[in-house]
């Protein structure tokens, strides 16, 4: 009482249980076809009218297969997943490590900010100082991370730094070139319609 939540009352005597249980059910196929939808991602409209981009299993698996090999996601700890699943760049951090046998570190909704990511990266000593397989960020997030992460903590924090979602300037990667020279830096481009990335 007093709340604005609607209630639904079901009287068990009114349900037709015998008739419902006698219905023949058709089992749906649990194996998707290549052209079946894997997900729909809504674009920002930067390449045209805002719309939902329909991503097929074929396109998704093609990208993930390529990414697991190119980013060598089986080397290291896996990847922190710090972005929203509504952002297609998260697909790389989430699925690529899992499909190559490494792990993902899911950040809580309270811990999605750059401060929490900084803390996780700075605390890698508890993982035996092993490197993350990959870290995917926008260049703006990289600039924020670079400003807060100590230079000595940049070294070995990840094997591959993947940047995308906006224009990348050389000044953004300069601290990483200087303090983490063994970290591979990749500028990935791709409109949502092409399944995350189509050019590096």
Residue ranges and their predicted role:
Residues 1-16:
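Structural core segment of the AMP-binding/adenylate-forming
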Residues 12, 17-200:
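Motif- and composition-driven signal specific to adenylation
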